[in-house]
Amino acid sequence: MAGNTFGQLFTVTTFGESHGAGLGCIIDGCPPGLELSEADIQFDLDRRKPGTSRHVTQRREADQVEILSGVFEGKTTGTPIALLIRNTDQRSKDYGNIATSFRPGHADYTYWHKYGTRDYRGGGRSSARETAARVAAGAVAKKWLKEKFGTEITAYVTQVGEKEIRFEGCEHISQNPFFAANHSQIAELENYMDSVRKSLDSVGAKLHIEAANVPVGLGEPVFDRLDAEIAYAMMGINAVKGVEIGAGFDSVTQRGSEHGDELTPQGFLSNHSGGILGGISTGQDIHVNIAIKPTSSIATPRRSIDINGNPIELATHGRHDPCVGLRAAPIAEAMLALVLIDHALRHRAQNADVQVNTPDITLSNK
């Protein structure tokens, strides 16, 4: 099965299934000398893990990470880092009714046709449980980026179903179960998600991800443009169906006189580009939006077929997120971090000696 490795110089290969013994990743290319412990990784895993509120899956996983290699006396050695997260709360009996049938909206049908076999327990490899390994790897990348450049990566939910969430400050993100940068709408969101769950249905979500203190010059035109790689990374997250960089689709209604970010000696006057021009970072904040589809596993009966092509009616039972987007913020942060560290290392490898006389204006306007 190809497609399990991400990156070129900082590579991450994930392994494991939803109901297997565990999952994890191998990180190769991490620079030596980075102080690293399980606690550095655990923080983001705890933000992503299931069972943290009534609005997400009630599967209870500790998601405790183990560092098996690549770290000696508290610092990375430059050799492969192996990270393991053991599964402890599998309930595979919940999936007996889908062993020979295909859930609408899931990867069951496509995995079966591609591989001729599939692990139907919780979706197997196609489950969003796999993203725990990405979050673990992303935590390592985030730590290196912060120490090297002061880079800070933040993600928050801006819409759940038809409920748009006003931005009131990033300090609120960690204080509610919705990863919302908002305080005043939390009770409304609680009631909304309760009604969605009781209706045996699900909703989608929209998230905003931003990276501050990104150095100018990251990105490899023409095929490995920074924005292209960010879009690739975000689309690789389960259930993501759309990506915007900067003004995104709003660019269609803007005039060139508005969209093009003007430059002055004091800095850029706007950031419609989302911090990327010509596929290369400008040094401004990078801004990304992603759209996540409604969770496909719902208890409402729906039409499908079995592996023999016979029509059936199927309801998916078990422990599922009524809005999978509510736990996507740490995953999106991780994927952006993995793109940035890979491009930082690629830039250093080829362009470390490049110097220009033009003053750096990029950080004066976010």
Curated annotation (Swiss-Prot):
Its EC number is 4.2.3.5. InterPro entries: Chorismate_synth (IPR000453), Chorismate_synth_AroC_sf (IPR035904), Chorismate_synthase_CS (IPR020541). Keywords: Amino-acid biosynthesis, Aromatic amino acid biosynthesis, FAD, Flavoprotein, FMN, Lyase, NADP. Its cofactor is FMNH2. GO terms for biological process: amino acid biosynthetic process; aromatic amino acid family biosynthetic process; chorismate biosynthetic process. GO terms for molecular function: chorismate synthase activity; FMN binding. Gene3D superfamilies: Chorismate synthase AroC (3.60.150.10). The keyword Lyase applies. One of its GO terms (cellular component) is cytosol. Reduced FMN (FMNH(2)). The keyword Lyase applies. It is an enzyme of class 4 (lyase). It comes from the Bacteria. PROSITE patterns: CHORISMATE_SYNTHASE_1, CHORISMATE_SYNTHASE_2, CHORISMATE_SYNTHASE_3. FMN binds at residues 125-127, 238-239, 278, 293-297, 319. Pathway: Metabolic intermediate biosynthesis; chorismate biosynthesis; chorismate from D-erythrose 4-phosphate and phosphoenolpyruvate: step 7/7. It catalyses: 5-O-(1-carboxyvinyl)-3-phosphoshikimate = chorismate + phosphate. NADP(+) binds at residues 48, 54. Belongs to the chorismate synthase family. This reaction introduces a second double bond into the aromatic ring system. Homotetramer. This is Chorismate synthase. It comes from Neisseria meningitidis serogroup A / serotype 4A (strain DSM 15465 / Z2491).
